[in-house]
């Protein structure tokens, strides 16, 4: 029996009907702030991705507010290169998001599988990401955590930017002013490391680091 199967059998959310609508079927992935499940939207009869915040973060009012803002921020972006957010709510005291389910992989997994990309391949994913970011920036949303794990690669169509959980709306008051730095060190602009403040240029910097990694197989420098 695989670890994934064991996890599914012991996870209390598996089989649960969330919000009287979303039937959780299995775990898809686990990240730093949430676990993503595959669920069936029984109202619209379609599979969706259900992102549930980790229990140890549920008591943090700041994090809960940030998590809820993810849905509002991402919902303002309508673009084929951005993972759509459909719904949000709370289950067993944990915030959740209902998102578009992408059939495919991500850039991190592709890099691990094949190493450095060809120039056309790297430019394609870079262009897809830039187009999605342009749509987000037009509505005042920055991502703050652009990295290969957050670039999904469907079996067809353009790459899609995922996980706006660390996003901040430029037009809204930003909690980054408190000095809490959000992001992955290898990909963040030096200005963020120094001030914890970001703007659209920060996303472009991160995309440039990804392009370097796709062409060479490594980031310019390790996390420090």
Question: Model features per residue range: what roles?
Answer:
Residues 92-106, 110:
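Conserved short submotifs of the Hanks-type protein kinase catalytic core
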Residues 54-76:
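AlphaC helix of the eukaryotic protein kinase fold
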Residues 88:
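Activation-segment/catalytic-loop signature of the eukaryotic protein kinase fold
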Residues 24-31, 36:
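Protein kinase glycine-rich loop
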Residues 129-141:
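Protein kinase catalytic-loop region centered on the HRD/HxD motif
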């Amino acid at each position: 029996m695989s670890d994934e199967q064991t996890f599914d059998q012991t996870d209390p959310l598996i089989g649960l009907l969330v919000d009287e609508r979303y039937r959780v079927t299995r775990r898809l992935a686990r990240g730093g702030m949430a676990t993503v499940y595959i669920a069936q939207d029984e109202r619209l009869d379609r599979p969706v991705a259900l992102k549930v915040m980790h229990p140890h973060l549920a008591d943090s009012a700041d994090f809960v507010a940030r998590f809820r803002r993810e849905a509002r921020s991402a919902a303002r972006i309508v673009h084929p290169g951005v993972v759509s957010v459909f719904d949000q709510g709370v289950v067993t005291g944990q915030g959740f998001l209902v998102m578009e389910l992408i059939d495919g992989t991500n850039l991190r997994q592709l890099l691990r599988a094949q190493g450095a990309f060809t120039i056309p391949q790297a430019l394609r994913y870079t262009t897809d990401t830039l187009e999605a970011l342009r749509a987000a920036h037009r509505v005042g949303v920055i991502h703050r955590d652009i990295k290969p794990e957050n670039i999904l690669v469907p079996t067809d169509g353009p790459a899609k930017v995922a996980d706006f959980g660390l996003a901040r709306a430029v037009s809204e008051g930003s909690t980054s002013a408190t000095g809490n730095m959000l992001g992955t060190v290898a990909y963040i602009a030096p200005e963020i490391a120094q001030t914890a403040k970001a703007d659209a240029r920060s996303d472009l910097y991160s995309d440039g680091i990804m392009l370097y990694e796709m062409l060479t197989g490594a980031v310019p420098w390790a996390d420090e």
